[in-house]
Amino acid sequence: MMAEVLRWQSGMIERIAHTTPRVTNLWLRVALSPHIAGQHMDVRLTAPDGYQAQRSYSIASAPGAPLIELAVEALEDGEVSSYLCEIAQVGDTVELRGPIGGHFIWSPDESGHASGAVLLVGGGSGVVPLMSIVRSRAARSGAVRAASPMLLLYSARSWEELIYRDELIAFEANDPTFMLRFTTTRGAKHRDVDFDQRLTEMLLRTALAHWGQTAQLVYTCGSNAFVETITSALVHQSIPAERIRAERYGGTS
């Protein structure tokens, strides 16, 4: 059976919000196949002279949401990110292709089977696909949440640069099976349970001990260096490599 060919489609920007000093969130309406938490999509821009620039962005919205939400970090000299963060306006259209990706997805059945305890570790904008997983889980039944306790470790430079900070705190306050720990590398922590240091193997060990669960699945997303550090630390914590799903982002566009 041949795989479905993904085609470019026009998506209209319906909402824009500058959510942190470096990140802009965009909500787009587009007729795409339903996505699975953890997937991404391609965005393509075409200049009047025909020049095209393309970039992949993780989907932040939960499966079934009426709009596709992207969180775009403004990168120096980034062709696509500069347009989306600084120029794009509500009502504009961009080309989208997706959803894409099958190795970084979280999609348990309604019993929570094949899930178990889930550890999420994100650095910077690497939290975006993890946010789709968190939202997907929050929308599931109590039985699924109970069968898949979750810990999110999220590292950013400062409190102000934590994307989805308030929403994540609210999830934790309303769900005893969801645990959240922030780490900030250049600013003070704002909650006693958090950490104001780089996410190291020792810090990871401390957070896992407080969690008290054995991760059956691990999702980590961030820069190449961040993901390498986390995956190495996880293996040292005796988490089998086959349980770890990693997604890296580059530094262009």
Segments from the language model and where they lie:
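Ferredoxin-reductase
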Residues: 2-92, 156-158, 183-187
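Reductase modules of NAD(P)H-dependent flavoproteins
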Residues: 3-9, 150-253
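Short, conserved phosphate/pyrophosphate- and ester-handling motifs at nucleotide-, phospho-/glycolipid
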Residues: 38, 126, 223
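A short, basic/flexible loop-to-alpha-helix module at the beginning of a structural domain
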Residues: 99-113
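Conserved beta-strand elements of the Class I
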Residues: 117-119, 218-219
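Histidine-anchored nucleotide/phosphate-binding helix
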Residues: 127-142
